[in-house]
From Swiss-Prot:
Protein name per the record: Uncharacterized transporter VC_0195
Keyword Transmembrane helix listed: yes
One Pfam match: EamA
Chief location of this protein within or outside the cell: membrane
GO cellular component, one term: plasma membrane
Sequence ranges assigned to domain EamA in this UniProt record: 22-149
Intracellular or extracellular location(s): Cell membrane
Phylogenetic lineage: Bacteria, Pseudomonadati, Pseudomonadota, Gammaproteobacteria, Vibrionales
Domain of life: Bacteria
Amino acid sequence: MFMTPDQQDAKKGILLAISAYTMWGIAPIYFKALGAVSALEILSHRVVWSFVLLAVLIHLGRRWRSVVGVVHTPRKFWLLLVTALLVGGNWLIFIWSINANHMLDASLGYYINPLLNVLLGMLFLGERLRKLQWFAVALAAIGVGIQLVVFGSVPIVAIALATSFGFYGLLRKKIQVDAQTGLFLETLFMLPAAAIYLIWLADTPTSDMALNTWQLNLLLVCAGVVTTLPLLCFTGAAARLKLSTLGFFQYIGPSLMFLLAVLVYGEAFTSDKAITFAFIWSALVIFSVDGLKAGHAARRAR
């Protein structure tokens, strides 16, 4: 069947979106394979090798002018320094949660994230919430509240992941720097701390790459690919798809994490988690229905 250029572009965008969110969803398999390495050490390798790969990509794409332009814009420079701290913290919490058998909490965090984004948009960008959006956010809050009050536990990992990534997304939206340039500068800001840790501070059986097996070293170097490849797929998808369309793929990642946690790694799906997940899933269904209704209304208005 013949497809127009726009349809071909949209099809490519859908494939890129599925690829990006699938890679994010199965990333825990990679981090589980590095279970013998400390979270801080994995984070440091992630920063170093992501920086190296991004530097190569920027050089090949002749994008150094874009990098220099951001560095010479104080507002963007300092905001990127803040986003570097946020994404670094997010990466560290995520790596720790996977290797400490808290993958369900990580999954919950990324389910909560779209709802938190709506709330942050209202608080900091002047966006107005529709009634169903309010209802969805309230349901999510009730789910977390029940876990706190009835079961006496707080999903700290989930809240930390959702909050750090939510504020990261908010600031990156304000900065308006392309993903590749932004992530390159963020890893550049984190590079000194990562290098100091790996060279002088790390004192573990895996910290000396000269003594590691080549298989382990290859896994550590692949941290750059694991970080950068899904991001490139995501930015390619974002350039080809409407934001509303892209939004429906964002649940692939946490859903795959959830399935991995329960079916592959045997994490306990306890009653407190089940209730919280039920409320979050219900909130996301309402959130998605509201998005569909808003999209149809906008098309009719045109």
